[in-house]
Each structure stands twice: as C-alpha cells, then as structure tokens.
Amino acid sequence: MQTNVVSAQEWEAARQNLLLKEKALTHARDAMAAERRRMPWLAVEKNYEFDTPKGKASLRDLFEGRHQLIVYRAFYEPGVFGWPDHACRGCSMVADQVAHVAHLNARDTTLAFVSRAPQADIARQKARMGWEMIPWYTITDSFDADFDVGEWHGTNVFFRDGDKIFRTYFINSRGDEQMGGTWNYLDITPLGRQEVWEDSPAGYPQTPTYKWWNWHDSYVEGAAPDKRWVEVSDAGEAAFRNKQAGAKP
C-alpha cells in the first residue's frame, strides 16, 4: 500500500494546505444552503393519510405542531430484500444514524420516516433495531409516488403555515449521505469508504460500492458480501439509473 511518510513540519504544511481547501468547501456548502433556503415553495393540495401507532393521521398531523417536517422514505415493506425481518440495508443505515430528535425539535422541526409496512411490523422492527425514537408511519395512498419516492429512497421537506402545507425541498440518491455520520466519518480516514469509485492511491483496499452494507446486528468480520444482496443492489441501482437517464430532456 502506497504511503508518504514525512517530517512533522511537512505534515503540518500539508494539513494547512488541505485546510484552506476544506474552508473553501465549507463556504461553498454554506452558500448552497443559503440558496436552498431561497428555493420557491410548492403548495401541497392533496390530503394524505398515514397509519400511526395511534390510528389515522394526516400529513399535517405528522408535523406534531411544529412548522417544519422532514420525511425520509424508508423501504420496509413486502418485496424489499430482508422482509419481514429487516428493512432495506441502506435505509437501515440511515435509521441507525439518526441523532436524538430533541435537537431537531428544538429548532421547530420534526423528523419522520414513512414506509408501506403495517404498523405492527414497523413497531417490531423499531424495537429490535433500537429505533424507538424515530416516528415511523405507514403510507396508505399515493404520497410516495406524488413526492418522487415510490421506487427509491429520498428525503422531502415540508413547511406548515397554519393549515397550509408546502413542499420546500427534495433530495435522493447520494444526496441522502449527508444525513448519515458513517460516510462522513469514513471520509476523514486515510482509506476512505474503501469503495471502487473513490480516487485513492494505488494498493488501497477497495470493494464494490454499497455491497459491504449490512444490518448492524449482522456483520461478520471477513465475510464476503451476501450474493443475493449484491444481485438486488445491482438491479436496483440499474433501474434507478435507467429511470434517471430516461427523465433527462
């Protein structure tokens, strides 16, 4: 494996040079966030209904009285790899990394996950995986299709002004990585995520993208990726890419 061992002075000089670029990236990210806050809003005209542990609820109810609502579409339902014992591996990783929601609530913001699994299955899965803190509801209508998450994970953001609800933001695919600490932590290590798409020095370990993902209670050190998961992951990625390509003008 290629390495470059230098003196303390040379190391500090390299770190300072990288720090300048990191600060520029931070400023660019701040500018992007400012632009995001100025995005136009889209009025939500339809009424949507969800199953919850307490019965039926509207989209407005999901705000829990707050003004902002973040909705992550997690794939846990019949037909998903791992069902009914597990949710999608990627969605499970996102759920594992949700911070204490009190911090979001303190900023007038509610986080919710939605899937098509029945509430009984969601409750069992939350208890087993330690996700009790995440409000997780069942989609009962066209909510997922209407908000671009019918076939792929994604995050929608809504704002409530009285009884009026607006869609203010949407992101999916790799954009959802910013909601997960695992990827950010790995990005500051010398080996990175160790996936084949990364630009790393020759000889650094790399494996097929996403294939190492697993449920947090199912990792086996040194074990090869599950063949069925590889097939499902590849098929899902291909379908998503083809759909994206077909949508381009």
Feature names for model-found ranges:
Residues 1-107, 124-128, 141-249:
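Non-globular targeting/processing and membrane-anchoring segments
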